[in-house]
Amino acid sequence: MAAPLPRSLSCLSRAVGWWSRQPILMTQSTAVVPVRTKKRFTPPIYQPKYKTEKEFTEYARKAGLVIPQESLERPIHLACTASIFDAYVPPEGDARVSSLSKEGLAQRTERLKKNVASQLSIRRIKESDPNFKVKDFPEKAQDIFIEAHLCLNNSDHDRLHTLVTENCFPDMVWDIKYKTVSWSFVESLEPPQVVQVRCSSLVTKSNTYGQVTVRMHTRQTLAIYDRFGRLMYGQEDVPRDVLEYVVFEKHLANPYGSWRMHGKIVPPWAPPKQPILKTVMIPGPQLKPGEEYEELQREAHKPQLA
């Protein structure tokens, strides 16, 4: 039994020796190693409990909830127009040219054409405002004009909003925040007169606006002071004759609307306005610490002995 063991060992040694004598071949092998990455999250598909909006609304009503209706439309409140449509053009020299001359005849013909358009507009205004009368309107317009300008004296902007339109309000209060306005009405040189009436619609045919142009020849006083109390424009004790063409507007579609001042028409032949008096600061003397300006004035005016 001991003889076969050495024979098997010799066979194994021969095989190992033969394998060791073989040339070694260098080969490259690719290995795929699985690497775990971050798993992407996919949200589940949302399945609403109520498939239609009607089912959701019915369920909310049963639960006692009131869902406000969402509207993509934004309402716009058009209380007034943005400008004066078909503005009245005052004739040269306030129509004082003789009707026998060529210029006077042309002015009279143009006035007749405008009167026809004014009569049609008056008819449309009376359909919405039956109380409108051309004879009574000038006095009412003059009262609105006087009260609106008196609101500038005490800066009553709340009352001014009810007398002028949103288009006219910025023009009246512009650049008078730090100023003092003193305006007064002296007298009316000529009775106010309606020179033009226009009626137009905006956005829709039923949304109509009426504009009435009133000629006013009055005597007024105006003085504007800056924030330091220095006079910038006009004089309080010197009245001046003023010829103005004032436009009044009313939103006829609004049953609670009223006539308000909308703007003024300045004719091209009107005289230029008085320029504003500009005030400048005069630099005083440089004071040392502890000195006062009054002491320097006393020393400057102190009599000197000869």
From Swiss-Prot:
GO biological process: mitochondrial translation
Entry keyword annotation includes Ribonucleoprotein: yes
Gene3D superfamilies hit by this protein: 3.10.450.240
UniProt subcellular location: Mitochondrion
Keywords attached to this entry: Mitochondrion, Ribonucleoprotein, Ribosomal protein, Transit peptide
Statement: the UniProt record of this protein carries the keyword Transit peptide: yes
A GO cellular component entry from the record: mitochondrial inner membrane
GO molecular function: structural constituent of ribosome
Position of the signal peptide: none
Domain of life: Eukaryota
Predominant localisation class: mitochondrion
Purpose: Component of the mitochondrial large ribosomal subunit (mt-LSU). Within the mitochondrial ribosomes, required to direct the nascent polypeptide toward the tunnel exit and position the exit at a distance from the membrane surface.
Subunit organization: Component of the mitochondrial ribosome large subunit (39S) which comprises a 16S rRNA and about 50 distinct proteins.
Family of the protein in this entry: Belongs to the mitochondrion-specific ribosomal protein mL45 family.
PANTHER family attached to this UniProt entry: 39S RIBOSOMAL PROTEIN L45, MITOCHONDRIAL (PTHR28554), LARGE RIBOSOMAL SUBUNIT PROTEIN ML45 (PTHR28554:SF1)
Protein name: Large ribosomal subunit protein mL45
Organism listed in the record: Bos taurus (Bovine)
